Amino acid sequence: MQQRSNRRSCSYIPLGVHNNAEKSLCTEVAPARKNKRSITTSPIVNINVVERRLFNLELEKQQLRAKNLSENTGGGSPNGGAYLDAKKGVREQDQYQGGPSKELDRLQPPPSMKKSPPRKKKSLKDLIYETNKTFYQVDSNKVKYKVGLSKKQLLPSKTVDN
């Protein structure tokens, strides 16, 4: 075979023996090119592109789960059947993982969503007293510091130079 005089170099790969034919049979193969995109693009990856791709992968996984659930139910009611099957799938996954079922956690709202008890209005003086009580031992006029500091340590020390 003749090699074309092209600016691209072609690589020749010897083929194995076919039907006991010639051992030195060679065929021309397409030129070994590197990925053009990897050559032309910068090595810095745009974070937004990666996030979008990951998000799309998550969407695809969810769509596949929905298809699998709908196939398993046999075309039952889309609302109730799929929901029950989803719970069943979650339970099975938990059993495989060996962990406890997290179904109870899902039924209860997170602590941040729970309503806090109604607050009582307190005077500023009472609030200051309570905060001081946590950090200091307050006893009428005497204040002992719980942190281990005394008033002398808090005041800047004065040095007397003669």
From Swiss-Prot:
Q: Primary place of residence? A: nucleus
- GO CC list: condensed nuclear chromosome
- Please provide the Gene Ontology terms (biological process) for this protein: DNA recombination; DNA repair; negative regulation of DNA recombinase mediator complex assembly; negative regulation of mitotic recombination; synaptonemal complex assembly
Cysteines paired by S-S bonds: none
Origin: domain of life: Eukaryota
Q: What does this protein do?
A: Involved in regulation of meiotic recombination and repair of DNA damage. Inhibits RAD51-mediated recombination when the meiotic recombination machinery is impaired.
What does the subunit section of this Swiss-Prot or TrEMBL entry state?
Answer: Interacts with RAD51.
Name used for this protein in its record: Meiosis-specific protein HED1
